[in-house]
């Protein structure tokens, strides 16, 4: 494993700035269940690891009766199936989160990571597609929303 820098931005703007600066040489860390394996195997060559777990909006679950449920990209799966609003209104999301790896993996893995990794074995993706889940994607030019199905095909 080669030496890499580590950055832990505390705002979404800072995280986006790092990702823009380093491009393909940045590794995005939410839970790390896939990224760390790739780094150890030298299958992903990164100059910097951008750890997004300290970005508040990426690490929270929000529910509003009008706008629905928002789950940040770095929320660990175990927090999803322990949330009372998710249990009450979105049990299918719990099903999707609970099939990602075993108990230890679920303490770190996230739906965002499962989706962004784009692995054929991404356990939660079929359920998210069936439920019509959308991704809110942040970039240097603002936000956009994309259905999970389109995100997976991009």
What are the functions of these language-model segments?
Residues 1-154:
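C-terminal structural segment of proteins
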